[in-house]
Amino acid sequence: MAMLSTASVSGSVDLPRGTMKVDSSASPEVVSDLPPSSPKGSPDRHDPSTSSPSPSRGGDNQSEVISKSEEYRQLFRLPADEILVQDFNCACQESILMQGHMYLFIHYICFYSNIFGYETKKIIPFAEISCVKRAKTAGIFPNAIEILAGGKKYFFASFLSRDEAFKLIHDGWLEYGSAVKSEGEILVTEPQVSDGVVKRARSSMDLANELDIPVRDETLHLSSSSSLPVISQNGVPPSSVQRHAEPDVDVVAANTFNWKPEDTDAPKLSSDFTKVAEAKFSIPVEEFFRLFFSDGAVSFVESFHKNCGDKEFRCTSWQPHEKLGHTRNVSFQHPIKIYFGAKFGGCQESQKFRMYRNSHLVIETSQEISDVPYADYFTVEGVWDLKRDCRDSVEGCILDVYVNVAFSKRTVWKGKIVQSTLEECREAYAHWIRMAHELLKQKKLENQEGNKLIEDGEPLAAREERVSECDEEGKVEMVGEGVVKKSLKEAWVNLTSFVKRQSGTRQVIVLAFAVILLMQVTIVVLLKKGGGGQVEYHERYDEYSVNGETLGWLEKRMHFLREEMMMVEDRLQRMRQDHAALKAQFHHLERLLRRNKQ
């Protein structure tokens, strides 16, 4: 794939890059009494001890660094107290893409470019910045930063280390810029304690949910008057905050939550949702919420995300909402399983719950992901449906988890996105249910031979047996593929040795014949694999158990298969065209060879 105008222009001349760096570690996620702009233990950007080179370097190197910093300061005509923090190789997007360097000073962001004698200088004070967010070059490559300052938008692309540059810019903006926050992060702020009451302000995510407006931008603006406390296991636990404050009616505490079920039945679930997990627990619905979803259960939620490979987990407290019941926000970094681009994608998840008649608890989630292909095309919606189970002597509950991938734009990859999302959700929720049962066994709230995990209407033992059978089939297939690869390798070695012994014209003919042969082999392999597609039947039924939900699932499956067949047909058509072109070229070479012989 060709890179989209991000390569540096040949002949560009830039000033030498600076080498002065500071430790720009982010503020620790701790609910404390210190302001967020100056947390305890965080480095000072203008502290000489953090902006100087390593102590192992001599005085000559230090003076050289200072002289370079002074040279850049004079280039941009900055105040005398400005110190160069770091510089990055990037490009500024205006009418054309200008390759150059970004120089980060304590109070300024500067950019310099010199292409064929055409100089460009840009100076952006941190005090004028109103918005900073990560962006994508051409909407695909996550290597750009967008800055809004003084009513003007600046777009910097082609960063080799975009996250490091964004972190430095973000820290400098929070320390020396305006009070507006960036990047959609749930920031740690000072809890305002007044008369023993912890006051919490709603975030803009809650306002967006109230108005039913999807938050598509990566930037979340919070006013300086808002304070959004965060429950984090890296900092002070939530209990330590509530020990010094009396419980407020506006705060959903872990142990003092007052259940107020609505005197209505839960709304019916849309047919767009697909069941991905089902389980039974031998505890009441209220106890289930307290152990796994309350403010006191954040440690369990964080341990689940860590086991899934997530990092930077943050979670707010439950807050009452007039229209949505109770809401909270969760954010984390999730690993991306692709070979290019970012290794982690930012996930912003809003959660809300309501208790209906007969202890029917419904928890709804809406998750948006950034830094992944087609991230702005879809949103992952989830529903945790928890019902009371009084059939046994001990009151329990039954959990059903449903997922829907809601698309806002059309794409030919919709089927693949939905399939991969559902598969990952099945694995994640199955792991969550296993962890929940282990926690109940540790607390002696469930027997060792108690509730069995059910996934997609299938017992765990049967699912494990089916997985083992699939593994054995996969091993046999891998052995067969290994034999084919070995034979192809030997054939290629023999072919190359034969070509080396031939003349120039014969080499061309032999290579063309080899290409045509490889194309035919590829077509045969693709057609052979197409018949054995990776299809999972998530529901087992007989001819008497077909219901509306099963028919809906079959219709969706047929739609996805139809899309996949269209893509395969397009690919085969292109391969036939390539094959015809190669065949025509081969005949042309044969005619040339005959003419040369005559």
Swiss-Prot record:
Compartments, record wording: Membrane; Plastid, Chloroplast
Keyword Cell membrane in record: no
Listed Polar residues bias regions: 1-11
Coiled coil feature spans: 553-595
Glycosylation sites: 61, 329, 494
Transit peptide: 1-68
Main location: membrane
Domain spans labelled GRAM: 70-134
Induction description: Expressed in response to pathogen infection (e.g. Pseudomonas syringae) at the vicinity of the hypersensitive lesions.
Stretches the record annotates as Disordered: 1-64
Annotated keywords: Apoptosis, Chloroplast, Coiled coil, Ethylene signaling pathway, Glycoprotein, Hypersensitive response, Membrane, Plant defense, Plastid, Transit peptide, Transmembrane, Transmembrane helix
Alphabetized Gene3D superfamilies for the sequence: Pleckstrin-homology domain (PH domain)/Phosphotyrosine-binding domain (PTB)
Pfam families: GRAM, VASt
Ranges of residues in domain VASt: 272-444
Protein topology in the membrane: Single-pass membrane protein
Domain of life from the UniProt record: Eukaryota
Cellular component per GO, a single term: extracellular region
Phenotype of gene-disrupted mutants: Lesion mimic mutant with a light conditional appearance of propagative hypersensitive response (HR)-like lesions along the vascular system, and associated with expression of defense genes, production of high levels of salicylic acid (SA). Increased resistance to virulent and avirulent strains of Pseudomonas syringae pv tomato. This necrosis symptoms are ethylene-dependent and associated with ethylene accumulation.
Membrane-spanning residues: 507-527
GO annotation terms (biological process): defense response to bacterium; ethylene-activated signaling pathway; negative regulation of programmed cell death; plant-type hypersensitive response; response to ethylene; response to salicylic acid
UniProt function note: Involved in ethylene- and salicylic acid-dependent cell death control associated with cells in the vicinity of vascular bundles.
Protein name as catalogued: Protein VASCULAR ASSOCIATED DEATH 1, chloroplastic
Source organism of this protein record: Arabidopsis thaliana (Mouse-ear cress)
